[in-house]
């Protein structure tokens, strides 16, 4: 293999590793239920915090709370994936590389 191509691959690998480390420090926040549920998630799809307003905690309506949490978590994951894709797009040229996230 050409030494130049090998060097480029090594440089790209180092840049991707650095970008992944940066994503661990980037966060986004989402909410559902008019702000009753708040989720903070980082760029590596790790949930950092969950906040639930006492007003939505009701033993007789646990299903509503479950739905609000599920909606917030799914939206948080989606936003985190968008954050990662945006951050990595300059390195990958818009290509979706399996295994990055």
PLM regions: where:
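N-terminal intrinsically disordered, cationic/polar leader segments
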Residues: 25-51
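Long amphipathic alpha-helical segments used for membrane anchoring, targeting, substrate engagement
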Residues: 1-29, 79-101
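Stable alpha-helical structural segments in soluble proteins, enriched in small hydrophobic residues
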Residues: 68, 72-83
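Hydrophobic (often cysteine-bearing) scaffold residues that line and stabilize catalytic clefts
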Residues: 65
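A short interface-forming secondary-structure element
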Residues: 50-62
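Residue-level signature of catalytic and energy-coupling elements of molecular machines
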Residues: 9, 45, 69
């Amino acid at each position: 293999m050409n030494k130049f191509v090998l060097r480029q691959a090594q440089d790209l690998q180092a840049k991707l590793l650095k970008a992944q480390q940066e994503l661990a420090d980037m966060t986004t926040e989402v909410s559902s239920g008019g702000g009753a549920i708040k989720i903070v998630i980082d760029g590596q799809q790790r949930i950092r915090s969950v906040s639930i307003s006492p007003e939505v905690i009701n033993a007789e309506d646990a299903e509503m709370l479950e739905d609000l949490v599920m909606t917030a978590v799914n939206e948080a994951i989606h936003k985190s994936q968008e954050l990662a894709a945006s951050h990595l797009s300059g390195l990958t040229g818009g290509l979706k590389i399996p295994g990055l996230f």
